[in-house]
Design a protein with these regions (language model features):
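Non-catalytic nucleic-acid-binding interfaces of large nucleic-acid enzymes and RNP effectors
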Residues: 1-251
Length: 251
């Protein structure tokens, strides 16, 4: 039974990974459009603006650098996209003309990052695997720091096998609050959306043991993986998690 539930959750996470899904939505917008602009490039631009809503020219240049590295080419592309009414420009920032539907946004908020596993992760046998059951294989090295060099897989597998559960007292009595210190990571509106999604996820995992996967950074430090539920979260997030197996520790 758990394997079917696990696969269903992973399918949702794979479908609603944030940027890939927004690029897909951008592609749907431009698919039938009558334009001479490169539709693949246009879909990517619209995807970024669906995420950020508005961006300065310098930010757009950074986001699109791998796609259109030529400054003059990008400038002409943005001008044409504005003239053809795919985006707006207010003199300072490029602004999206499209919004994600409320239903789609809710799914993105909930499934934009792989959720904790309901069953013990698959054994990681090489650097390209990640412990999940569907073959995504994001690897155990964070970001783009892929390597074929030997890393300690035994440690990753040991951490992955630790069974966890929610601290129901903390779920019911503790509260996550936005502060100005969070402004660099998310604004109040984004925080409120995150909070709503997190509460739904916590309800889904109530009374259900779960597992977190782990990855290394390029320096060899290990990090638990998770967005709504993560050991290495803020104080509120940390308070939500208990070991499933408990022992009384005596002097």
């Amino acid at each position: 039974m758990f394997i079917n539930q696990e696969i269903a959750i992973e399918q949702l996470s794979n479908k609603y990974q944030l940027l890939p899904r927004l690029f897909e939505l951008g592609k749907e917008i431009v698919e039938q459009a009558d334009t001479e602009l490169n539709k693949e490039h246009l879909a990517k631009l619209l995807g970024f603006l669906l995420l950020y809503k508005q961006c300065s020219p310098s930010v757009i240049a950074g986001l699109m650098w791998n796609t259109i590295p030529d400054e003059q080419g990008l400038s002409e592309f943005l001008m044409k996209a504005t003239v053809e009414d795919f985006i707006d420009f207010n003199g300072n920032k490029f602004i999206t003309k499209f919004l994600v539907s409320e239903e789609e946004q809710k799914k993105l908020d909930m499934y934009c990052y792989p959720l904790p596993l309901l069953m013990e992760p698959k054994e990681v046998k090489n650097n390209k695997q990640d412990g999940y059951y569907l073959k995504v294989d994001s690897g155990i090295i964070l970001k783009n720091n892929r390597t074929n060099d030997d890393v300690n897989l035994d440690y990753i597998n040991k951490e992955n096998k630790i069974k966890l559960e929610l601290n129901q007292y903390a779920v019911l009595n503790n509260h996550n609050e936005w502060s100005c210190d969070m402004a660099n990571q998310m604004n109040k509106q984004m925080f409120d959306r995150f909070n709503l999604a997190q509460q739904e996820i916590l309800t889904c995992y109530k009374d259900r043991p779960f597992y977190l996967t782990w990855k290394y950074d390029k320096r060899g430090r290990s990090y638990s993986q998770g967005y709504h539920i993560n050991i290495q979260s803020n104080d509120y997030g940390k308070s939500l998690i208990n070991f499933n197996h408990k022992e009384i520790i005596e002097n």
